[in-house]
Amino acid sequence: MNPESLLLSCSINNKGLTVLSETYAGGFAGALANTSAVNCTVNSTNTFEVKSTSDYAGGFAGIASLGWSADLGKGDTKNNLLGGVVDLVVKLLSSNADISPSLLSLAGVNPSYILGATVSGPLNLSGVDYVGGMTGRGNGAYIASSSADYLNKVSYWRNKVYDTASVSVKDVELSGVQSITGKNFVGGIAGSLGTAKVAGLLNDTLGLASYLGFTVDKVTVTGPTTGLSITGEQRIGGGFGDAIGGSINTVTIKNLKSVTGNNRVGGMIGLAGPGDLADTGGLTVNLLGLNHLLQVKNLLKVASGVRVTINDSHVIGVADGLTVKATGTNSDGGVVDYVAGGFVGKSHSCEINKSDVKNLKEVSANDTDGYAGGFIGTSQTGGLADVASEEDLKGWITKDTSVL
């Protein structure tokens, strides 16, 4: 059973490329839903612009999400046969912890894969919320090399329709990108990556961390020699605006000139981890698909689903030096903490290993209301303090991290 779509070795090659949409704008695809794109290429040599006048803009895809019925288009199927099937499967998911991957796929509970993708050219990318060099937003998405390990997660290879040996192994590369601008959730690779939501269902019964957490592996972003500039307001990062629930491995951001925002600004990630769960006694956003206030204690079974691990990842500034700035102030009488970090702006229960920042010139935040750090602006156990094990809460930044 191969329920997802497959795009294999497809390409766009132009001297000039402009993509303009109200929402879901992508250099290759506006939206990927339960879709695998393997070794696909977008190349524009002279001019390259992707713009969304609203949300979701990406150099490769506007959004990479679950199946249409379970996520993007779940509201479109309530009154037809497909909607009835999805509703039935969702009920089964909520009551059966031993559900099969095929049944999950039938409901669209299957992530999208961007494997071995290449985006090249003088890209200028813009939108409002969720703007990223590869994708504006990824719900449980995989952005990784087209190695056999990842191909075998896709049904066409898992079910032996295709042989992994017939596919060239390629890393994910974004080169030549000049500027990425937006309002909230803006990043060089993704505006936001998070654990997927499934038709409003909190899937602690599914083994959520292993099945629906995002994965980024072997990705390189290279700006021009003049440098890549990334600009926004909230959750702005050289690699990711925010990242909640997943793993980031072997990621490099090169020729980064500046990352600037109002708050939560980082050379690699603006905000990493579950966010401000403990600060308000609960989480009011739709994390993990919940549409109501989520108390910290309710995360007990899915604590690992909101934790972020980062390994062997690097931020390299331009020769003149990288600047990271959080420009917000409390001039209006507010009590907001403004944070900026050379690697992560705000780190909540995030494990970072063998990662560094080079050619860092300046990190700044407001003198009175801000926190700025060469590697991390603020680091704390955050929302996982009451749900993770004692072992998890021991100091999650290792001695192999550095700023040069």
Segments predicted by a language model, with ranges:
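Surface-exposed loop/turn motifs in large extracellular/passenger domains
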Residues: M1-L404
